[in-house]
Amino acid sequence: MNVCSNTTKDPLTLMAMWGSMKGYNPEQGFSFEGPEKRLEVILRCTLETHVDGLRSLDDSVWSGVVGSLNAQIVSRESNEYINSYVLTESSLFVMKNRIILITCGTTTLLNSIPNILEAISAVRGELEWVSFMHKNYSFPWMQKGPHTSLADEFATLKQHFPTGKPYIFGPVDSDHYFLFCYDDIIRPCSSEDDTQLSMTMYGLDKEQTKHWFSDRFISTSAETAAIRAATHLDRVVDGTWTLHDLQFEPCGYSINAIRDEEYQTMHITPEDHCSFASYETNSRAANYSDRMKKVLGVFRPQRFTVIVFLDPESPVGKAYNEGKGIGVEPEYYPEYNLLHRTTNEFAPGYVAMKINYVRTAAVEETDTAVGGAEPGAEGGPD
């Protein structure tokens, strides 16, 4: 899963790729890009759409989708609502009316779009919503086209979805997200109750990361259960979830979990110089603090970014629109300082919120972590 580079890049070139200069070290031989690219495509079901939608397609279709971005399917689980796939680089979830594809490293996620559109056509669905997003790359100079620059990513997306709109959440020279949305939802619709919680964490506790190194590849077994118990991952993904996980060789770990219509996924890069973990779920709750505290308890990061998407009819969306706390606010995390917060409303009641936190003890120190945010005073809403 590791890549290496000894190419010298000047600051302007790196900024053109909208990464941070903090992580660039030409003497560092191996650095894995933990922050993922994420693509979600939702179809509108019509009278002509296959009754099982996208889940009617066999695994060979999804192997083709994943192969087009230079990854492979490693394991699979399913329930009544979701097909879950752990990949060589992160995860794929397939539901009746949507695909969620999350890939790390130097995968070329946008190259999968033609295959995905073919899959939608095969089940006679209509394209309703597309979102592509990723946090700023830790090692942008290692990416492959069309991900070598923001301009190339944007041009590729506009080619496929001409009416889509781009957004940037956060300071361009540190922790931020690029988001592109295509919206063809016919409103008012019957229900808009989706939700998404994503966390990216840097500077992980070394007492935890030591568990995610191995001299061999280990798939879901008593051995991976022991890893989950030792790291307290089993407090995040408990026995009510159907899970499949992978311990990579020489290091790295991925887990997917599904329960009815909900999913959780985590991916871990444990190397000291680029330690990183990501977490995502669509689990329904009116307040995320309990879940986020469990995740932070596993990784104990020096800093983290949380991004939340709230549909108006979701439990957390209703709480937000009623002026209640939703569990991402700084009062829930006294050991961290809020550095920056961005909120955007895409459509009536549909909100995206991104918040950067840094551990309190590290605020006055120089942050040397890969792709690091500038330490500083607490920020407020934009």
Swiss-Prot record:
Output a single Gene Ontology CC term carried by this record.
cytosol
The enzyme's main class, written as a single word, is: lyase
The record's EC number reads 4.1.1.50
Q: Which family does it belong to?
A: Belongs to the eukaryotic AdoMetDC family.
Protein name according to UniProt: S-adenosylmethionine decarboxylase proenzyme
Superkingdom of this protein's organism: Eukaryota
Quaternary form? Answer: Heterotetramer of two alpha and two beta chains.
What is the disulfide pattern of this chain?
none
Give the site residues for Cleavage (non-hydrolytic): E89, S90
Keyword match S-adenosyl-L-methionine: yes
Which residues are modified to Pyruvic acid (Ser)? S90
Which Gene Ontology biological process is one annotated for this entry?
A: spermine biosynthetic process
Catalytic residues at: E33, E36, S90, C104, S254, H267
